[in-house]
Amino acid sequence: DAPAVRPMFAALVATSDLFKASVEDLDWLYPGRSYQDVAHEWLEQGAALVAVTLGGDGAWACTRRQQTTVAPCPVVVADTIGAGDAFTAGLLCALAEADLLGAGHRADLRAIDDPTLTRVLAFAARVAALTCTRPGADPPTRSETHQARRQSGVT
């Protein structure tokens, strides 16, 4: 029941620096609203960064200062199970590598520049894409993640 869940989301957003959702999640939770509109509302409620996975259309993220979209990574899809979790793990990994996580870095996350935001989002999308190349929720290996990091420009 989406109307019953919305207040819980509002409470979570108000206390979260980072919020990730899929476009499917948002279509269910806020029917008839664009993901961009919902994300900007979440920023107003307190989130520093909102990331939205767009399925086969890539991913999008925004802060109050900017927004960026990354194209999907071209892979042969075996299974999409675990892709969202892998995206979130990749996003957190890349943000940690950029020293943008934690209460002490909240202002830095809010001020993330466009090149960094794009690199972080591209890395998360690549990790999700790697997960889709094999059946089951089978995230990439450490070696594959390092290769993805190099390919997406995250150091």
What do the PLM-derived regions correspond to, one by one?
Residues 31-155:
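Conserved phosphate-binding/catalytic region of the ribokinase-like
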Residues 1-40, 47, 57-58:
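Conserved beta-alpha-beta core of the PfkB/ribokinase-like small-molecule kinase fold
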